[in-house]
Amino acid sequence: MFFRNLTLFRFPTTLDFSQIDTLLPPVQLKPVGPLEMSSRGFISPFGRDEQEVLSHRLEDFLWLTVGGEDKILPGAVVNDLLERKVAEIEEKEGRRPGGKARKRLKDDLIHELLPRAFVKSSRTDAILDLQHGYIAVNSSSRKSGENVMSEIRGALGSFPALPLNAEVAPRAILTGWIAGEPLPEGLSLGEECEMKDPIEGGAVVKCQHQELRGDEIDKHLEAGKQVTKLALVLDDNLSFVLGDDLVIRKLKFLDGALDQLEHSEDDGARAELDARFALMSAEIRRLFLLLETALKLSKAE
């Protein structure tokens, strides 16, 4: 259940989530209809078989999960059937259907195929830190994160969440760290980075599995390249890649964090899930607060 990526948003800490368990059932995920392409709604963080519990709260952390069902209609299949239909009409009527007629034919085919299409299920998890006013979505896609914000908005009626905004240019901070400026306490460089020329269409250099402080890196910095992605390690607990878009990718929980689970005395699957949720939430909070200071992240009003 550990998150692998983090797309972060901020929201005012004054928001009231006390009625969340009452507000979620009306926007629970419903099965995608025969003539629908997709369906979205909340599901239980504990899995689709759990129908009663649609959220999970532990102290100031709230766990929400948006589920999805999408019909799979391969474009190649639709286009192949469309061409056959067009050929039949051309042979029968001696003319080839125009653009509008082809669009109608395609829409008819899709409606015909939808009830028989396979359904792909998905889930996107999010943790809300109610004390510090941020939400961490388990995705590297901004669009996926925005979709989760939209679902929460639909449940609450209003949810003024905004993407992270840094008061200093993230590229400048990341470039400074790799150039030798002191990192925040507990943070150290990993073995991966991406550097770009600041000009449009400029060169891109990707480094992996190598020391990030050395002559090779220095030459790229001297040539004016800026760091757009940087691998970092937080103590022995987390490793991740921070982008200049403020998205955290390749998040991994290390032994320093996982060892805490081994000392848990709770038994049972739900107790283990609770322990993992508590650990993950606390580590993400620690990382967020560190980045909030280092990058001067704006607060939501």
UniProtKB/Swiss-Prot annotation:
Domain of life: Bacteria
GO MF term set: double-stranded DNA binding
Biological role: May be involved in recombination.
Keywords from the named record: Cytoplasm, DNA recombination
Predominant localisation class: cytoplasm
GO cellular component: bacterial nucleoid; cytoplasm
Species, as recorded: Xanthomonas axonopodis pv. citri (strain 306)
GO biological process: DNA recombination; regulation of DNA recombination
Name of the protein this chain belongs to: Recombination-associated protein RdgC
InterPro entries reported in the protein's UniProt record: RdgC
Subcellular location per the Swiss-Prot or TrEMBL entry: Cytoplasm, Nucleoid
Family named by the database record: Belongs to the RdgC family.
